[in-house]
């Protein structure tokens, strides 16, 4: 557990923050095709169930978002990166603080990073 030498943490975190905003937009609009591009199969199923339970659309603006790479763990099959996001959202007109850890997974044999889990901290 740690960050491998030579890993482009700044580039990784810039992409993670951009994907945070994209995923929030896809969640708000209920865009399953977009969600499926950035999530693991298990996470996609979870989000699909939550979208059905939510019903309707939401309107979220990411006001501020900071990201911190907590570490990367590698197994025989995949790399797992944990990123802590702290920020401020405007959800349906109401300001909310957000603090959560996203676990991103990437196959060892190639492929992109996908959202595999979310842990709320607040």
Please place each PLM-identified region on the residue numbering.
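Short beta-strand edge/turn micro-motifs at domain boundaries
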Residues: 80, 94-122
């Amino acid at each position: 557990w740690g960050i491998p030498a030579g890993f482009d943490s700044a580039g990784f975190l810039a992409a993670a923050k951009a994907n945070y905003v994209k995923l929030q937009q896809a969640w708000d609009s209920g865009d399953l095709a977009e969600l499926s591009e950035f999530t693991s199969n298990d996470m996609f199923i979870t989000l699909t169930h939550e979208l059905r339970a939510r019903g309707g659309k939401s309107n979220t603006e990411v006001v501020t978002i900071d990201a911190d790479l907590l570490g990367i763990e590698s197994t025989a099959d995949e790399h797992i990166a944990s990123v802590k996001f702290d920020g401020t959202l405007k959800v349906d007109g109401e300001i909310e603080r957000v603090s959560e850890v996203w676990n991103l997974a990437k196959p060892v044999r190639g492929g992109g990073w996908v959202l595999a889990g979310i842990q709320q901290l607040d």
